[in-house]
Amino acid sequence: MMARKRTVGSVFKFDFGLGPAENSYVKIGAESSYDVSLGYGFTDVNQVYAIDREEAGRLRRDFCIPLNTAFIVDVPDGNYHVTLMVGDTLTATETTVKSGEGRLLLHRLQTAAGQFIKRSFAVHVSGGQLILAFSGIAPRVNALEIAASSQIVTVFLAGDSTVTDQEAEGYPYAGWGQMLPHCLNASAAVANHAKSGRSSKSFIDEGRLEAILQLIRPNDYLFIQFGHNDQKPDLERRTEPATTYKHFLKLYIDGARERGALPVLVTAVHRRIFDENGLIINTHGEYLQAVKELGEAEEVPVIDLADKTRKLYEAYGAERSKRLFLWSVPGEFPNHPSGSVDNTHFQERGAIEVAKLAAEGIRQAQLNPLMLFLN
């Protein structure tokens, strides 16, 4: 079946492998390199293999093995409901899927030999391309269905480097917002606007809040986590906890509410700095209390991620907690050949744990309906 350039409202159906295509599906093989005229394809076909087990069922009999490559579909910006089918009649599989700038959707999804699983999730697209990156020990993709949806709730994130989508070149660096999609079902998508190095002030001054407010819709959410860079001495970022910090945070709250969206304040995650008794030192000073006071005054839910990460780090202990952050020895990670000692930024496993804490906070704050959309 020949595909055409897609428009708003289109439904995409792809059948991967060597066998004949299922009815109404576009066949994708190992040679299906991204073609701008078609608007879909793999980024690197040298990392894709196609197999046909010649069993019953056109979607089950064959598949592609995408080894650390991505499948791209050109689409209008917006939210999409995506359903992925994976499995193999002959052997066990393990597949990880990320979208866009490394947002985790499926983590080490496993199937036994002869088992086939369908998983659905929501993806927020900006930039005109839906990108699904595949990895894993034995990844598979049998079929893929994509449909635009106006019913999906969007969780917008405003924050700093501890929240942001870290670039692939920095792997295993990751922000907790980058891992949050893994905690949500197909009814909610994450739009991560967090940016490294920003404070509550500089984020606004650069027009980043305004960019969110142009997109946010009634009943969407705006999660707001700043504090790390508000402490910095430069005038472009510096705020004072009792005054300017609260002032700028209130602009996020007011902007969301004016558009019918729901603001949520999040206290800044702690740095990994222990005292001699194995307890976390609060390096954020009065900024944490300022968030709580503002939340109470404005009747805005507060997720105390500072307290949750404190408990997490202390439970891990001073030495073991290094594995949550980008502590590495020379040669451990190709992107950091000289090693790294970083007590602020997470590596992927740490970001996943903190995203789970954020999800726990959503449930504890009874953020309805978002709490119903947690995995």
Each language-model region and where it sits:
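Conserved SGNH/GDSL esterase-like catalytic core that processes O-acyl groups on lipids
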Residues: 151-157, 162-255
